[in-house]
C-alpha cells in the first residue's frame, strides 16, 4: 500500500531549486506516514531552518526523511548529508565510545577513574568510579574561571578537571553540561592514547559504516556538510542580556553555571568556533540517519546489518538497574542519568534512553521494543523554542504507534540511499 504524504522520493543526495527546501525528501514505510507529516510540519518556511528524521525498527531503517534549509539565508536546501551541531545529544555519542571501550575490557564501570587516569585522583577524587562520573555525580559541573579560550582547548580542560576540587554536589546527580565530555575524553585518552575526535571515527562511524558522526567540524573531503545554526543574530550584541546571563550563571543557577562561559552565545554564531574545538559534551555534528543507526544498533541488541557493534550483555546492562528518577540538582527537574544516557521523567510516554540536546535535536533508543530514532535540526532560540524541546515527545509517540502497526501488518525497510525509491517494496511515506 502506497501512502502519499508529499515526500519527494527521488534518490538524490542534494537538491537544487529555490523551492527544494519546502518539500520533504527521502523515504518511509507507509505505516509511518503520520510520523512524516508531523516532522514536515516543523519546518514551515525558510526562517525556521531544516532538519532530518530517521527511524529504525528491529535494526532496519523504516524512515529516512529531510526537509528545509541548511543555511541562515534560506538558499541551501537540506540534504541527506546535512548535519547540524547537536549540542548535548553529543553526550550520547561520547558515552557510546566509552561503552565500546568497556566492551573490550579496557574500562570497568566500577573501577576508580584514577586507576586509568592517575592525575584525576587529586583533591579527593581517588575513589570516584567511572559509573559515578557517567551518572553526573562527580561534583565537577561548574565552569567558574574557565575562559572561552580554555574551553576551546580540550587538553587544558581535561587537565583542569583532573586537578579540580569537587564541589558540594559530589555524589549527587548534578548535570555536567560541558565538563562531562572532557571527563570522558580524559578517561578515553588515558586508556587509548587517542583524543575523542579520532575515537568518534574509529569507534562509531567506521564500525557503523557511516560518515555522519563527527566531533566538531567534519574534514573538508567528508560528504557530511555542517548546517548553519539558525538563531537571532543580534543576541550576542545585547549587552544587557549578556550581563544578565553572566550574573545568573555565577550567582543563582548551578545548571546555568555548568554551561555558561563568556562569549557562549557568540561562539555558536557565524562560523561557529566551537566546531573547531573538541567538546565531547556539546559539539558533535550528526546526520539523522547516522545517529539513528547508532541507536538502532543498541535497540537491536547491539547488532546492525550483521555488525556486532556492542555485545548483547553490555546492552542488557544499559537497560537494567536504571536508578530511581530524582530531581537533578542543577537542572531542577527529575532525570534518570545512567551510564551517560538519560531517561525522561514522563512515565511511559517516552520509554527508553538516549540524549536530547539544546534546541531539541535528539537520539533515542528502546531496546525493549526495538525502536530507535534520531531527529536533528539547526534551529536554536527561535519563536518555536518550546515546541522544539517538546516536539520530539509527540513524534516519538507517533513512532511507537506506527511501529506497533508495522509489526502487526508487516513493514518494508527503506531502500538504501542511492537506489531509486520507487522500486517495488520501497514505499515513500
From Swiss-Prot:
Q: How is its activity regulated?
A: Esterase and beta-lactamase activities are inhibited by the active site residue modifiers phenylmethanesulfonylflouride (PMSF) and diethylpyrocarbonate (DEPC).
Family annotation (InterPro entries)? Beta-lactam-related, Beta-lactam/transpept-like, Beta-lactamase/esterase
Coarsely, its chief localization is: secreted
- Stretches that traverse the bilayer: none
User: Could you say which enzyme class this protein belongs to?
Assistant: hydrolase
Q: Which GO terms describe its cellular component?
A: extracellular region; plasma membrane
Q: How does activity depend on temperature?
A: Optimum temperature is 40 degrees Celsius (with pNP-butyrate as substrate).
Query: Which GO biological process annotations does it have?
Result: glycerolipid catabolic process
List keywords of the entry alphabetically: Cell membrane, Cell wall, Hydrolase, Membrane, Secreted
* pH dependence per the entry: Optimum pH is 7.0 (with pNP-butyrate as substrate).
Q: Please write the reaction equations for the catalytic activity of this protein.
A: a fatty acid ester + H2O = an aliphatic alcohol + a fatty acid + H(+); an acetyl ester + H2O = an aliphatic alcohol + acetate + H(+); a butanoate ester + H2O = an aliphatic alcohol + butanoate + H(+); an octanoate ester + H2O = an aliphatic alcohol + octanoate + H(+)
On induction, the UniProt comment says: Up-regulated in acidic and oxidative stress conditions.
GO MF, one example: triacylglycerol lipase activity
Q: What is its EC number?
A: 3.1.1.-, 3.5.2.6
Active site (catalytic residues): 88 (acyl-ester intermediate)
What's the family? Answer: Belongs to the beta-lactamase family.
Task of the protein: Shows both esterase and beta-lactamase activities, with a much higher activity against phenyl esters than against beta-lactams. Shows esterase activity against both long-chain and short-chain p-nitrophenol (pNP) esters, with a preference for shorter chain esters. Hydrolyzes substrates containing beta-lactam ring such as nitrocefin and ampicillin. Functions as an immunogen that activates both humoral and cell-mediated responses.
Q: What is this protein called?
A: Esterase/beta-lactamase LipL
Q: Per the UniProt entry, what species is this protein from, by scientific name?
A: Mycobacterium tuberculosis (strain ATCC 25618 / H37Rv)
Its taxonomic path starts at:
Bacteria, Bacillati, Actinomycetota, Actinomycetes, Mycobacteriales
